[in-house]
Structures are given as C-alpha cells and as structure tokens.
A protein has these predicted regions:
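Core catalytic lobe of class I
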Residues: 1-122
Length: 122
C-alpha cells in the first residue's frame, strides 16, 4: 500500500484542508493507519509519503501502529532542484520529502525481481 496523506502544511486547497490542528491530524492519521494495517496481508508493506512538517511525528505514529521492529527504511526523495526553484516565492524551499516503509509482520519479505544487466545503459 502506498499513501500520500495531507502534509498538514497550513495551506488551503480546494478539496481538503491542509491546516488541521496537530492533534486532529494525528488522530486522522492514526485511524487510517490502523484501518490499513487491518487490510494488509500478513506479508504486506505500507509506504507513507510525507514532508518534514509532520514526517517525524508520522514515523513515531507508524512505530506505534505497526511496531518498531516492522520499520524497514525511510527513503528520501528529491522533489525540487535548488537551481530550478523560483527564489522570490519564499526564503526557503523544501527539496526533499520522506517515504516511511513498514511491513505488517516481521517475516514479510519484498519480492525482488532480477535486473537485466546484460546491456550497457550508458
């Protein structure tokens, strides 16, 4: 399962409020994570995409719902390039977001496909 929940950045969007009270956002996320955990197969994985405005709180919440022993990795995704960002928009632009990856149960293993390295890509 891959989810991209509201980042709770304080912005107003047409279809949802991204400026929730912190405790409201945590409650909303806990409810959804608990539901998703019930829906996951025993060998299932969940990837949750977030930025740093709530990323560290989400990590602790996912530790509680899925268990710290089921945490696999936090991936960091570059979403902007500094040299291509309009500087006048804001003083500081976030360039990296996070994806927290958990498994439902300890024995779950990702299915890895063999890469075809028989040709030169470069």
């Amino acid at each position: 399962v891959y989810i991209d929940p509201p980042y709770n950045t304080g912005a107003a969007f047409e279809h949802y409020d991204d400026a929730l009270e912190h405790s409201t956002w945590l409650g909303l996320m806990r409810d959804r994570l608990e539901m998703l955990r019930r829906l996951l197969r025993p060998d299932g994985f969940i990837c949750c995409h977030i930025d740093d405005s709530e990323g560290h709180y989400l990590k602790v919440l996912m530790d509680e719902v899925f268990g710290r022993s089921n945490y696999l990795v936090t991936l960091y995704v570059q979403v902007r390039y500094a040299e291509k960002t309009l500087k006048q928009d804001m003083a500081f632009h976030k360039q990296v977001e996070q994806i927290h990856v958990y498994r439902k149960d300890y024995g779950a293993q990702p299915v890895l496909t063999q890469k075809d390295l028989s040709f030169d890509k470069f």
